[in-house]
Amino acid sequence: MKKKDSHINRRTVLRTSVIGIFGLSLPNQILANYSFAGIGKISHKGNIPAHFPNIDPEIISEVVGKSHFDLERVKALVDVRPELAKSVWEWRFGDFESAIGAASHVGRRDIALYLIGKGARPTIFTFAMLGAFEVVKSMIEFAPGIQKVMGPHGISLLDHAYAGERMIDKMTDPEVTGLKQTIDYLETLGNASGEKYLDVSPDEQKKYLGDYKYGDGMKDGFTIQLNMRKLLSLGPIGDFGGALYKIGENKFTYNGAPSVKISFDIRNDIIYSLTITDPEVAIVAHKIS
């Protein structure tokens, strides 16, 4: 019995060795006679999406957007596909924001903690909002100057810590203490409140407000309005946008993006157009309202 088994094993070894030696040079038709019959069969429901194998960009956008305010919808999306907890979206002009970054700058610690539990990658901005004092302090000590880095939408590290006070009534005493320590520490540094931009008075803001067109299409233009923080913001016509920070006479930057500049053509205190420039394009949009 042992001899027979030995004979079978020897034949098996020889056969597989030959395939191993010559397999790379065998024609595809010969290789197909072996165990490759199942390759190429795809099981799916309906048509394969055009974006496959990437996740639908609209879903990614929704996860990031809803992470600002809608925990239940975020759960509905992320519970099914936990990798969405790592979602990142570019709003416009290089303004990148992750789902956890969204929850962090609006002070939604409940959403942030849920996303962390699903595999999201917290940053120093998240830890500042959560009041993780020792973590924030150790990161700044390890990389001095990191406190000056701006978060999504050009929001500062200190403002993230302030945002942590939003849910203070649902925090434990140790959590409240940690948040207070974090805020005090960042205030003491003196440079964690972000870039210093020129002030724009409410009266000055008014002259920039309105719609600007650069083409014949309905969406070929921008709307300048005030955002929730009472700052000038620029977005597609009729839609929300990013903050405009003043850097010079009738000159602004978009959400603090260093390579994006917005300037206005003003004559006799009347605005005629705006020009947006980045490293690749320059667009002139004329004021229509």
Residue spans of the language-model regions?
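Repeat-mediated protein-protein interaction surfaces in helical alpha-solenoids
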Residues: 40-44, 74, 78-82, 102-110
